[in-house]
Regions:
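Glycine-rich Rossmann-fold phosphate-binding loop(s) that bind the pyrophosphate
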Residues: 154-155
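Rossmann-like dinucleotide-binding domain for NAD(H)/NADP(H)
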Residues: 231-324, 333-335, 368, 372, ...
């Protein structure tokens, strides 16, 4: 059953942080905000990697902002049903991840890791400088210039990776049937666009995956897709662990079909595999990235709490609105079903309310309506709106 809530406009908002959030981001909050240790009384939550799926979400909670791109740790459907808007910060960590992907390409092309480990193992050996000249050939590799790189997924990170690899002299192929206009404009014109991932599999020496984890993409790198690839291909995964089937990649590494698998998500299986370069989830772990993510997350929360503006939500439609100049603003999170606007306006007109401006946006099963009106919102008005079937949360600003 849907959980509904009536929320009056606040002048003081309570923020709960579930992980360490950059101070630079937290300083964006002004004197109208204070931090709380109690999740039950929070108006908004800032989170990075903490698992929220088993947490009890309080009736006060209006928003959750993930300081990062992935939201697998947040119960999106539950939040939508409770009228809690979930935000992410796409692109804020894109440069950090891009740089690590390029590093991963170089680590896979040349046995830098093996060479470093050899030095550590022999650092106390007498005459190591002469031994280096004798052994360095064991760690020889290849240059990436002139090699073919396939980028699957041309979002904020994928575009940066493709452009950077092109500048390094690689022949870059990109595939993304859902590329946005913004990202298409940002993509180098020298990147070769292909329509199917199969073309990438058959063509490229290096393949890097930058897609979200969902049913359609889970284990997309598997025995069948690997079978289409070149012998000695290098696969890079800086998106989500489950995009790659561990058992299939292990067999491909053992047979030599896959030369190296570079992953930012080591687990019990991949950490022990030969041929795997496992990085301990460092993709977004830079000071700059953490600052950028925190600032973006805080701004998203502030805009929603103070104006009702939604940007970069993952469970409700984006609906960017300016600060209202009317007497009041009513925001309604509701199911995306017929006649809802008619029902809202009927209630408002019964209280002799004049609607100065109306915005309605929808996304899948959910919708968001914003009414700027010429009178103060009363408890009775909120209650009447809340009683409409399909309404999830009513708020006045």
């Amino acid at each position: 059953m849907s959980i509904r809530k009536l929320v009056r406009g606040n002048t003081m908002y309570r923020i709960k942080t579930l992980n360490k959030i950059s101070d630079i981001g937290l300083k964006v909050f002004n004197e109208n905000y204070r931090f709380t240790e109690e999740l039950s009384e929070a108006d908004a939550v800032l989170v990075r990697s903490a698992d929220m799926k088993s947490l009890e979400l309080g009736d006060n909670l209006l928003a959750i902002a993930r300081a990062g791109a992935g939201v697998n740790n947040i119960p999106l459907d539950k939040c939508a049903e409770q009228g809690i808007v979930v935000f992410s910060t796409p692109g804020a960590n894109a440069n950090a991840v891009k740089e690590l992907v390029i590093a991963g390409l170089l680590l896979a092309a040349r046995d830098i890791v093996g060479g470093i480990n050899w030095v550590q193992d022999n650092k106390e050996t007498e005459g190591i400088s002469k031994l280096v000249e004798k052994e360095k050939g064991s760690f020889a590799g290849n240059e990436i210039e002139g090699k073919k790189l396939g980028v699957i997924g041309l979002g904020a990170i994928g575009v940066l990776v493709a452009n950077a690899a092109k500048r390094l002299g690689m022949e870059v192929y990109g595939c993304d049937p859902y590329i946005s206009v913004e990202h298409a404009w940002s993509l180098s014109r020298d990147v070769i666009h292909v329509k199917t991932v199969e073309e990438i599999y058959r063509t490229c020496d290096y393949i890097t995956v930058h897609v979200p984890l969902m049913d359609a993409t889970k284990h997309m790198i598997n025995a069948d897709s690997i079978g289409l690839m070149k012998d000695g291909v290098v696969i890079l995964n800086f998106s989500r662990d489950a995009l790659v089937n561990d058992e299939d990649i292990e067999k491909a590494l053992a047979s030599g079909k896959v030369k190296k698998y570079v992953t930012d998500f080591p687990n019990e299986k991949t950490a022990e595999m030969n041929g795997v370069i496992a990085i301990p989830h460092l993709g977004a772990s830079t000071e700059e990235s953490e600052d950028n993510c925190a600032v973006m997350a805080v701004k998203e929360v502030v805009d929603y709490l103070e104006k009702g503006s939604i940007k970069n939500s993952v469970n409700y439609p984006n609906c960017e609105v300016a600060k209202h100049t009317s007497v009041s603003r009513i925001t309604i999170l509701h199911k995306n079903i017929p006649s809802m606007i008619t029902k809202f306006t009927t209630v408002l007109s019964s209280y002799n309310v004049n609607i100065e401006e109306l915005v309605n946006k929808s996304r899948g099963d959910y919708a968001y309506s914003v009414f700027d009106i010429d009178t103060t919102v009363t408890d009775e008005m909120r209650k009447a709106l809340n009683e409409i079937e399909g309404v999830l949360k009513v708020r006045s600003i």
